Regions:
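N-terminal, Lys/Arg-enriched amphipathic/low-complexity engagement segments
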Residues: 1-44, 59
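A broadly conserved detector of short glycine/acidic/proline-rich loop/turn motifs that flank catalytic sites
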Residues: 16, 35, 49, 96, ...
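Structured core elements
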Residues: 30, 42-44, 67, 91, ...
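Generic structural motif
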Residues: 35-39, 51-54, 63-64, 68-78
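Aromatic/His-enriched, Gly/Pro-containing loop or helix-boundary segments
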Residues: 39-40, 61, 101-106
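Acidic, glycine-anchored pre-beta loop/turn
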Residues: 45-51, 80-83
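Short hydrophobic beta/alpha edge segments that flank linear recognition/processing sites
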Residues: 52-64, 88-96
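Buried, small/hydrophobic-residue-enriched core segments of structured protein domains
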Residues: 80-150
């Protein structure tokens, strides 16, 4: 075991370059079922349909009113299903000119909640102990905030 106290000096020569390089653009994105435990989707789009970034793609059958939105604008390429038509993934080919949906939000609690639901950000909330997306009418007893990416 290595113990470090009072920092560590790394022998790196030179200094960082202050430029932003043009990396290749992403051509397609996908929503994977493994990211959403226990979710059963009701599809709101079809293959070949054009979607905007932030547009509702599917709704959770088990949790009515909880929507999942498109991470990018483009054309729905594939809706992949497995055994017994189990949802596996939905693939979207990104267009060069991306369109997106604007979400307006005021200071009221109901409008903030509606914005979170409509934009698909409600899915970032998790219930304990089973790590599921909370229902839209549930009121939590406590909110835990984790500032570490794990």
């Amino acid at each position: 075991m290595i113990k470090i106290s009072k920092g560590l000096d790394l022998p790196i020569s030179g200094s960082p370059i202050n430029t932003i390089s043009d990396e290749p653009k992403v051509s397609s994105v996908a929503l994977l079922s493994n990211d959403f435990i226990g979710m059963k989707p009701t599809m709101l789009v079809k293959e070949g349909e054009t979607v905007k970034a932030g547009q509702k793609i599917f709704e959770d059958k088990k949790n009515n009113g909880v929507y999942f939105t498109s991470p990018a604008g483009g054309i729905v390429k594939d809706i992949n299903r497995g055994d017994k038509r189990r949802f596996l993934s939905i693939e979207i080919d990104i267009k060069d000119t991306e369109e997106f949906i604007n979400f307006d939000m005021d200071d009221s609690v109901d409008q903030i909640k509606d914005c979170l639901i409509d934009s698909g950000l409600w899915n970032a909330f998790r219930t304990r102990p089973f790590n599921r997306t909370p229902g839209i009418n549930e009121i939590p007893d406590a909110v835990f905030i984790n500032c570490c990416d794990s």
